[in-house]
Amino acid sequence: MVKYTGQLNRYFKKDSIADIVSELPKPVMTLTDMFFPANRRVQKHSSLISLEDITAETGAVPLVRRGGHSVPVDPNSKTVQFIDLDGIIISRFFKANEVNDLIASGDTENVQAWVNENIENLRNRISDTTETLVRQALSGKIEYPYATDTGVAGKMEIDLGTPNALTAASIKTANIGDLQAWLEKTLSEHAKKAGSVSQPVFLLGSAVYSKVVSIVCAAQNAPVLWTAEGMKLFGKYDIRSLSMTYTLPGSNSPVDVIGANKMRIVDLANPGKLIYAALDDLDANLAPMPFYCKPQEMKDPDGIKLIASSKPLPAFAMKRQSEQTVTTA
C-alpha cells in the first residue's frame, strides 16, 4: 500500500477537521440545540470530570457506572472526586486498494472530497448519538450500552436526579379559560419548587399536546401564535410538543422522551450544561472536542481505519425542572 503518512494525515489535523466541520451542513439535533446552545456547551481540559462541576449544575452527585469507577485525589487534605467518563468512538474501514487508487490519482480535490464525505458521515453518527444521550438524559437517568476492548457489553449509568413533582391535573373538559388557569397555576407551583422561571417552556407529551391544540382550536379568536415548535399562548406560555422517541443501540424498541400524559417545565435559561471531556487521544492533543477524526493504518487486512471520537455528558439541572401528570380523556 502506498504510504499514506504525510499524504492523508495533513487532511486530519485539528484545524483542518474544525474547518471541514464548520462548512458541513448542520446536523439535526433537535433537543440538543434546544437545551444546549453554544453558550451551554463546556469543554473540560481533562478526561476526568469533577463531581463538583456537575453538582453545581444538577444539585446532585450524578454518576454510577456499572463496572467503572470514580477517581479520588487528596490535594491539601481535601478529597475531590472525578468521573472517568466513557466516550463515543466509532470508525470506518477502507481497503488498501481503495486508498491506493485515491492517493495515486494525485487529485487533491478528489482526496479532499473523500475526506469531507467520510468526516461528515462519522460526524453525523456522533451527533445522532449525542442527541440520543440528551433525549434519554431528560428522564434524569442515562443507561447507555457500551462495548469494552474484550467485546463485553455493559452500560454507562448516569443518575442526574428527578424533576420536581407537580400536583396532577385534568384538562379533560377544559375550555380556553380553564386552560389559562391551569397553565398559570402550574407555572406558579413550578416556580415555588424549582425557583427558576426565567425562560420556562411547557413540553407536552403527545396526548396532552393534542388536547391543548383541540381546546385552542375550539375557542373563537384564541390568543395563540403558532410556531414551528408549537405555540405561544396568551402572549406568555411557550408550549411545545415533545412527541419524540429515541432508540438505544441493540434495541428495536423506541422509547418516548416523556410519557403521552406528561407535561414537563424546563427553564431554557438554566437547563444545565452539555460537557465535553478531553479525548484520550494524543493525536488530538488530549483536547476536549465535540468531534475528532483521524486515520489509522491497519494490517491483516491492509487498509485505513478512520476513527472518530467525542466525550459528551448532558448534565441536566433536574431540580430546575418540574413534571406533571395530566388527564386528557
Label every model-predicted segment.
Residues L8-A18, S22-P27, A137, A147-D178:
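Hydrophobic alpha-helical segments and helix pairs
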Residues G151-P223:
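Extended, solvent-exposed, turn-rich assembly/linker loops in the middle of proteins
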Residues I83-D159, H190-L203, D302-A308:
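Long, contiguous amphipathic alpha-helices that act as assembly "spine/axial" helices in icosahedral shell
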Residues C217-A329:
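Sequence/fold signature of self-assembling virion shell proteins
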Residues D33-M34, Q199-P200, W226:
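Short glycine-rich, low-complexity/disordered patches
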Residues Y144, V208-Y209, P312-L313:
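Short, solvent-exposed loop/turn segments at secondary-structure junctions
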Residues M1-S46, R320-A329:
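N-terminal alpha-helical "arm" segments
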Residues T32-D101:
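Assembly/oligomerization interface modules of large self-assembling protein complexes
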